[in-house]
């Protein structure tokens, strides 16, 4: 019922974009699915293709420093100082959420995550020209749990909680993100060289290790080794029940098929996934599509995983499939074990 949980989990990582923020006049949005390439890997120097798993907004600012200190009353304070582009009109820049990534080993990253998202007592804001800091009505929120944060597409018939568990145990770095909320309520001047936020912790920072701005990164987003592919056209044969799929124009010896996204016949019949139970033949679905497809993965002689396409449906049972029917497929590919 859930074949997607039996597939190989693709390679994943977190990338940091480094815009020339001093020259930016406004935020820049990068849509989900933006493609990045790895460094050359292996004997053939293959560049593995990764795509971003969510949209990211690059702001015209940078985190200049992050410093941990102690207030006169004994409370731990984290000071975050941001440098801002002099070309941006800051009264118009949307700062409703600034995402951060905890770029550290697991013990430090988890301690920082807990301090910011669960141990914050108060936030203070300091602007140029202010004699003293002012209270700020803001907070930090944990990221990575929303429907828009999924690392790979969710199956129609699966429970989203299972995917969260699978993502946590396979790529915990996805949940090492947090977002700063509340700056949209601040009235900034049109020209803003810098601003500073003091995060007062409810409980003292008792850990032996400290952190700097190197451990708190802006402009980061998860990426996964998935990318769009096309398959060689298939011509149906009445004597065949399975068809091995081959990516079109890919002969590098590393590319594998991760999913079959759509199947369309030359007579404009749409095949639906068997696991979606949207095909004709039961549950009073008289108007549903007459065709379905299913995939099976087998390891080939070369060690790569080959994907086989299995076709069925009421049209096949009644032998009403047109002769010389051909299929066009859209696929999602991966580089398999090569990037690991």
Predicted regions and their residues:
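Short, flexible beta-strand-to-coil junctions
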Residues: 20, 105, 200-206, 328-339
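Short, low-complexity Pro/Thr/Gly
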Residues: 81, 87-295
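Short, aromatic- and glycine-rich surface loops/edge beta-strands on solvent-exposed regions
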Residues: 37, 192-202, 324-332
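N-terminal start-of-chain detector that recognizes signal peptides
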Residues: 70-72, 167-170, 300-301
């Amino acid at each position: 019922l859930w074949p997607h949980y039996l597939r190989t989990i693709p390679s994943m990582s977190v990338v940091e974009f480094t815009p020339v923020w001093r020259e930016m006049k406004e935020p820049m949005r990068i849509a989900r699915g933006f493609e990045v390439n790895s460094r050359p890997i292996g004997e053939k120097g293959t560049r593995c293709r990764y795509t971003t798993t969510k949209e990211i907004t690059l702001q015209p600012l940078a985190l200049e420093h992050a410093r941990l200190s102690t207030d006169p009353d004994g409370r731990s304070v984290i000071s975050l100082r941001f440098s801002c582009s002099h070309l941006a009109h800051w009264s118009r820049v949307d700062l409703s959420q600034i995402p951060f990534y905890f770029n550290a080993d697991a013990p430090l990253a988890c301690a920082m995550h807990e301090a910011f998202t669960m141990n914050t007592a108060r936030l203070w804001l300091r602007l140029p020209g202010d004699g003293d800091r002012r209270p700020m009505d803001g907070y930090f929120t944990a990221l990575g749990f929303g429907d828009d944060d999924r690392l790979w597409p969710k199956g129609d018939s699966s429970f989203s909680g299972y995917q969260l568990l699978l993502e946590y145990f396979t790529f915990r770095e996805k949940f090492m993100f947090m977002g700063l909320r509340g700056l949209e309520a601040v009235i900034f001047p049109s020209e803003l060289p810098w601003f500073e936020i003091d995060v007062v912790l409810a409980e003292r920072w008792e850990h032996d290790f400290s952190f700097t701005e190197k451990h708190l990164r802006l402009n980061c987003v998860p990426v996964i080794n998935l990318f769009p592919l096309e398959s060689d056209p298939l011509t149906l044969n009445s004597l065949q029940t399975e068809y091995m799929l081959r990516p079109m124009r890919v002969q590098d010896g590393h590319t594998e098929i991760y999913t079959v996204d759509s199947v369309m016949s030359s007579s404009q019949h749409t095949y639906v996934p068997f696991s979606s139970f949207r095909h004709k033949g039961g549950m009073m679905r008289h108007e549903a599509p007459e065709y379905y497809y299913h995939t099976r993965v087998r390891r080939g002689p070369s060690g790569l995983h080959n994907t086989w396409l299995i076709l069925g449906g009421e049209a096949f049972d009644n032998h009403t499939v047109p002769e010389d029917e051909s299929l066009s497929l859209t696929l999602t590919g991966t580089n398999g074990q090569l990037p690991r």
